[in-house]
Amino acid sequence: KHLVPFGEYVPARHVPIIKRIYTGMVGFIPEISPGDKPGIFQIDGERFLVLICFENIFPEISANLIDSNPGFIVVITNDSWYGNSFGPFQHFAHNILRACETGRYVVQVSSTGITGVVSPDGNCEMLQKNGEKLFIQGIMEMKIYPRSLNTLYMRLQEAGIAMIFIVLAGMCLCRV
């Protein structure tokens, strides 16, 4: 649903100067179209949401699941463009937020970067080899438990957070 700017699409690509500069640098203009519905899949009766690459940074994608009700979330990614930096760890950290917001397990499978599982309470298990978590090959086996509850965040989303801040601001003002 969300394309990577300059990797999967070029903003303002129809403006001649932008098209000329980008084509000169890369050799082509990517023309990928975003999906129009969530990637809900089902295996052995278990429904799950598939997020591609950086879609896990958008809370509204996973929070808007009340109707489709997947039991867990899978993120497939290739984080090689981050290199050996903090990037793959920061990208993986978004899964902690998504797991806590939705009350579901989040499984990230990465061809490069971090492969791991985040439980609904935010605990992480990552594929490791000799302490390394990046650019390793291996198999990770872990039991996950599909869940169907709708969390308070899924029901209220950003409005719930806004209400909390309004209440806190009111409490602070009343003390003054």
Each predicted region: which residue ranges?
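Enzyme catalytic cores with a strong preference for nitrogen-chemistry domains
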Residues: 1-176
